[in-house]
């Protein structure tokens, strides 16, 4: 017999409507932000260190923020050196980076642009991002907190490191299979993937992804890797144009984050220092190691990837030399290079570099 039938009448106290609304709203917000946990206490100290007369006790074990890349357990080794030293950017060069867009000129460009727009829609949905129209930045539904920005950065960079690795891998195998040189493409593509991974590792020093974010990254990376792999086999030119358009969106994202920081919408980042891994990788000078400086460096990298991939998309994939890995006869003229001194928003045309 059901045990409920043996008990007396149960009287349920009415729950006030305003309390129910508060409970539902709080639960919804907590689930939406469950994908990320801060690993830097100052970011959340002011938000949650409210004085109360209660002592909250929980039997749930507290998660410990682990270091995603601790130093190697090797007493004889001081540091692991990288094969790709990052070029030094000046503050003037980084501030000169602008949002830009290359117009689609053929069916290949339109396929790439449409794919990026679809990917952008999915990324916005997962990260809760809504891009405001000009003049609507102060509307509440468009405002982003520090935690929400970090969630978007982590998701974006975990996916952005895929194209360079896939392209470099396929070109490496093609070079071995055909027993011919690759003309400098492999190194540039692998270096791009490494750079995007350094972006991710830097942001992971500031926040630890939760189970929801890990699941989303796993699914997105699995689908994106295989899709890009097959697409690169079919049309490398379209894939490079796709990455160029994707980096346009990345520049737009970081530009808005910088504007939010400069306008005072992200108060916890105003005096936040960049992680040590970022200081060493970008060779950040003394006095220019804040969160704002970090975002300027990352945006400059994304702008460089935008230029590189739009340029590679303009070349003949099987025969042309990678213009970012060569020594020019006349260095006094503007040419493609590893730095951002002569950065071109829409890439270099083939006639300019071949």
Curated annotation (Swiss-Prot):
Enzyme kind, highest EC tier: oxidoreductase
Main location: mitochondrion
GO cellular component: mitochondrial inner membrane; mitochondrion
Localization annotation: Mitochondrion inner membrane
Record text on cofactor binding: Binds 2 iron ions per subunit.
Its membrane topology: Multi-pass membrane protein
Matching InterPro entries: AOX (IPR002680), AOX_sf (IPR038659)
Molecular-function annotations in GO: alternative oxidase activity; metal ion binding
Transmembrane stretches, start-end: 153-173, 215-235
Residues that bind Fe cation 2: 196, 247, 302, 305
Disordered as annotated region, ranges: 333-354
Biased composition (Basic residues): 335-344
Known EC number: 1.-.-.-
Gene3D superfamilies xref list: Alternative oxidase
Chain residues that bind Fe cation 1: 157, 196, 199, 302
Cofactor(s) needed for function: Fe cation
Keywords: Electron transport, Iron, Membrane, Metal-binding, Mitochondrion, Mitochondrion inner membrane, Oxidoreductase, Respiratory chain, Transit peptide, Transmembrane, Transmembrane helix, Transport
Transit peptide: 1-64
BP GO terms, sorted: alternative respiration
Annotated family: Belongs to the alternative oxidase family.
PANTHER family linked: ALTERNATIVE OXIDASE
Role, per record: Catalyzes cyanide-resistant oxygen consumption. May increase respiration when the cytochrome respiratory pathway is restricted, or in response to low temperatures.
UniProt-recorded name of the protein: Alternative oxidase, mitochondrial
Organism from which the protein derives: Emericella nidulans (strain FGSC A4 / ATCC 38163 / CBS 112.46 / NRRL 194 / M139) (Aspergillus nidulans)
Encoding gene, per UniProt annotation: alxA
